């Protein structure tokens, strides 16, 4: 049972990972539990056939959510409960440990895990003690967890991504109705503050006010309608509307990346970025914040440039550097494509199945 602890707004990298996991392990039954109905019908169709099913439990009430999960456990009798997102897992894990001791628990830390208070460290440490295996999505996150829970149960496993790179830039821009001349800088994220989109706006404002960059457009992808309005308000405050476009939540990320020249990830915090992994597969150079697991996917000076989080001036200079040098973009893009081989979805799924089966979490005959 995969307790996602989140909603699914698109057919994104994590959704594709789940589908591949289901396909590569046909001998096992997977129950994916979300807090809202997934928004992409194609994903629902793909995940409700064969050995997979989707259940939806609202998390508006923590107690009701936990009770509903327990009901699902009684209904499906899973061999394993795999926690992903959501604070509710802190309550569920010890309950399952006591009342369903035959169930093996696994947790994946998809976010950075920097705990500042002793209380938070003790709470998270107790949660980790309930787990059979603790999976960090990057070495950076593993290091953060090891600061308060250094244990042999802790491993790093990259998720990896699936990419369709069949479209060339001309075809992709024609489909998206984007002109060929501008340099397209793309960034993908669900939240303005977490993903540092406000810093990106500040960086663009500084760049166009101090320099004369080549013709460019920044394409912001992944914001809901409300967050898109919030973001465009920041853009208007800086008077840089002509340099931005916002496509909202999309399922055609491969086409968008095929149409792009540079990928930007100015996050304040980031365990590791599936969007960057996708950009690497498309041969894009990357400008990103030097936080969390990002340095594992962006090698500074090789396939991209790293800047300090919230450093608008540094971000502006890095973007300008790549925009002014087509040759550097090409060289870094080629290195990105080679580096992307380390972040293949099938490899990530194989690692997780190995954790499930080899470590005795589930039998490959169950």
What is the predicted function of each stretch?
Residues 249, 268:
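Aromatic "clamp/platform" in nucleotide-sugar-dependent glycosyltransferases that forms part
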Residues 83-91, 109:
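Short His-centered aromatic/hydrophobic patch
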Residues 300-301, 305-312, 321-326, 341:
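Conserved acidic donor-binding segment of nucleotide-sugar-dependent glycosyltransferases
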Residues 285-288, 298:
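Short hydrophobic beta-strand element within catalytic cores of glycosyltransferases
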Residues 231-248:
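Nucleotide-activated donor-binding/catalytic signature segment of Leloir-type glycosyltransferases, i.e.
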Residues 32-40, 161, 188, 215-230:
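Glycosyltransferase donor-sugar binding loop
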């Amino acid at each position: 049972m995969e307790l996602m602890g989140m909603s699914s707004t698109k057919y994104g990298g994590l959704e594709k990972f789940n589908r591949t996991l289901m396909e590569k392990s046909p001998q096992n039954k997977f129950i994916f539990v979300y807090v809202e109905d997934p928004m992409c019908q194609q994903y629902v169709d793909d995940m409700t056939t064969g050995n997979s099913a989707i259940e939806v439990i609202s998390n508006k009430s923590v107690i009701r959510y936990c009770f509903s999960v327990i009901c699902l456990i009684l209904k499906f009798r899973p061999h394993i409960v795999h926690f992903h997102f959501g604070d509710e897992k802190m309550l569920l894990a010890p309950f399952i440990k006591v009342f369903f001791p035959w169930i093996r628990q696994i947790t994946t830390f998809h976010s950075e895990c920097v705990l500042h208070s002793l209380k938070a460290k003790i709470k998270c440490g107790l949660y980790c003690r309930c787990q059979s295996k603790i999976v960090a999505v990057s070495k950076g996150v593993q290091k953060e967890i090891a600061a308060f829970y250094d244990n042999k149960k802790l491993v790093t496993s990259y998720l990896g991504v699936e990419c369709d790179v069949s479209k060339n830039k001309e075809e992709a821009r024609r489909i998206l109705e984007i002109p060929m001349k501008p340099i397209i800088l793309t960034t993908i994220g669900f939240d303005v503050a977490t993903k540092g989109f406000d810093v990106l706006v500040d960086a663009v404002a500084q760049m166009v006010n101090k320099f004369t960059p080549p013709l460019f457009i920044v394409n912001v992808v992944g914001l809901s309608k409300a967050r898109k309005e919030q973001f465009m308000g920041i853009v208007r405050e800086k008077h840089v509307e002509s340099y931005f476009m916002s496509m909202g939540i999309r399922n055609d990320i491969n086409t968008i990346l095929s149409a792009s020249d540079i990928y930007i990830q100015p996050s304040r915090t980031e365990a590791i970025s599936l969007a960057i992994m996708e950009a690497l597969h498309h041969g894009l150079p990357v400008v990103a914040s030097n936080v969390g697991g990002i340095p594992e996917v962006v090698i500074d000076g090789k396939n991209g440039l790293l800047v300090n989080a919230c450093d608008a001036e540094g971000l502006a200079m890095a973007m300008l550097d790549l925009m002014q040098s087509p040759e550097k973009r090409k060289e870094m893009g080629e290195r990105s494509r080679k580096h992307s081989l380390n972040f293949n979805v099938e490899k990530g799924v194989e690692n997780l199945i190995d954790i499930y089966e080899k470590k005795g979490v589930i039998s490959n005959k169950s």
